[in-house]
Design a protein with these regions (language model features):
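The feature marks helicase ATPase cores and/or their adjacent C-terminal helical subdomains
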Residues: 1-465
């Protein structure tokens, strides 16, 4: 059994001191000047969260801190762990540091930069399941649940549909062995049998992988010690988006009182988009008590900051920076509209922009752009109450297509790159677009398999591979 070793904990990080020279070094690379508040965050190596308001440069600070740590990192088999809910953190490092030796070092062993799901898959669930005799074939919620759904007898599917259930019922929910069907009988047994057979064939949903991670951490104390010795420092980016179950897993993997791992969360509790959905939350877990705070937003001035503070979750108050438009005292605007006028809202917003700024100003700041932002992109009428309107961006703009909205699409699976490639070919008729997306996917696959940035991102993905 792996034994707890204090010398493998956070005490060994005391030899890493971030100095003014280190700060000057990273400023020269990033072309960014850090003030005293930001330097304090860069130098801090305690288990403290960073509450960063919009436009405060949180990502820049995190990337800078990682670069300094990677430069000074003395350990061969223990690394820095960076967790997020998307691949944005990794992409930022690839974008800003990917062509430097430090960037390449950060993106390879012994360090890990990835999503919360991929971390627990890689270091906990996959080894645990393999030790129990499972071979892993596929990890994908939609595909796996759909496959299980068609494993059910036709009569059972028909019965479930009449009870407003679909393939989403074909996965463990909240606990291993628990599904969203309480009634005992054949229907429940058919569902459980389908899940069991599917798992024996190596097919799991994303949530099931987290449930098996919890099972492993509950049973194996040596696993917890091993994770802490493997990663003496952990950063959680966009920490406000971590839900209660993920927080529980992180606390089991890196117990706060163990003194074996430093854990720092970076985020803004006022921007919690994904966390606690459908949860009865009594206490917000981020930031923890005594956070380091970045109050100054470089995104807008004090008039907007003061307005936003009135509806903010954070006890700390945000402050803005005066800009060239501050003296105009442009009115804050809220649109009230009837259901039949929804499609006019974007036009009205566009007119407001044209009335507020001159053509010269719009041209000067065209790089920043004017944007319409919404949370719900994909139309799912069957799951949304009819009385709820608007349901998403598509109700404001009839021609909206969700998969075109993200210019920097980075799917998690190779097949998704191929699907995008095929769709773009059909739309444009350009084979070069098809080849570009296929090459992007292959590059991502190679780097993911190697767990390092073997193939660098370039303007010509085909040439790069």
């Amino acid at each position: 059994m792996l034994q707890r070793n204090e010398n493998m904990g956070i005490k060994r990080l005391e030899q890493i001191q971030i100095t003014d020279e280190d700060v000057a070094w990273i400023e020269s690379i990033l072309g960014f000047q850090f003030d005293d508040d930001r330097i304090k965050i860069l130098k801090n190596l305690e288990s403290r969260d960073v509450q960063a308001f919009p436009g405060s440069g949180k990502t820049t600070i995190l990337v800078a801190k990682l670069a300094i740590l990677a430069k000074k990192w003395p350990y061969v088999n223990s690394g820095i762990c960076v967790l997020s809910h998307t691949n944005v953190a990794r992409e930022e490092i690839e974008d800003r540091l990917g062509n430097t030796d430090i960037g390449k070092k950060l993106l390879s062993y012994p360090h890990f930069i990835g999503t919360v799901h991929s971390f627990f898959d890689t270091f906990v669930a996959l080894p645990w399941l393999r030790s129990k005799g499972y071979s892993i074939n596929l990890i994908d919620s939609d595909l796996v649940k759909k496959s299980r759904w068609f494993m059910l007898p036709f009569g059972t599917r028909d019965f479930l549909e009449r009870n407003h259930k679909d393939e989403q019922i074909c996965g463990y929910n909240g606990s291993i062995g628990l599904i969203q069907w309480d009634k005992e009988g054949k229907t429940k047994q058919y569902i459980l049998d389908a899940i069991n057979k599917s798992q024996k064939n190596g097919n799991f949903t994303f949530d099931e992988m987290l449930l098996y991670s919890k099972q492993a951490l509950d049973i194996s104390e040596s696993l917890t010690i091993g994770l802490q010795q493997r990663f003496p420092i952990v950063f959680v980016d966009e920490a406000q988006d971590t839900n209660s179950f993920q927080l529980e897993l992180l606390s089991k993997a890196f117990p706060p009182k163990s003194n074996l791992t430093i854990v720092q969360g970076f985020g803004d509790c006022n921007q919690a988009i994904y966390n606690y959905v459908n949860e009865a939350v009594e206490k917000i877990e981020f930031p923890r008590e005594g956070p380091l705070v970045l109050k100054e937003s470089q995104r807008f001035d004090n008039r907007i900051a003061k307005l936003a503070n009135t509806v903010a979750v954070s006890a700390d108050q945000m402050c803005g920076i005066e800009n060239v438009f501050s003296e105009r005292k442009i009115d804050h605007t809220i649109y009230l509209f009837s259901k039949d006028k929804a499609k006019e809202v974007i036009d009205q917003f566009g007119q407001l922009v044209l009335d507020t700024f001159s053509d010269e100003e719009l041209l000067k700041y065209s790089k920043n752009g004017c944007h319409v932002v919404g949370m719900v992109h994909v139309k799912k009428d069957e799951l949304t109450p009819e009385k709820q309107f608007p349901k998403g961006i598509f109700d404001y703009w009839k021609g909206y297509e969700a998969d075109k909205a993200n210019k920097n699409q980075n799917p998690n699976h190779l097949i998704e790159y191929f699907r995008i490639a095929h769709k773009r070919l059909k739309e444009s008729g350009e084979m070069s677009v098809f080849v570009e997306w296929c090459a992007k996917g292959i590059r991502r696959l190679i780097n993911k398999a190697a767990n390092q940035n073997l193939v660098e991102a370039t303007n010509n993905p085909l040439k790069s591979i």
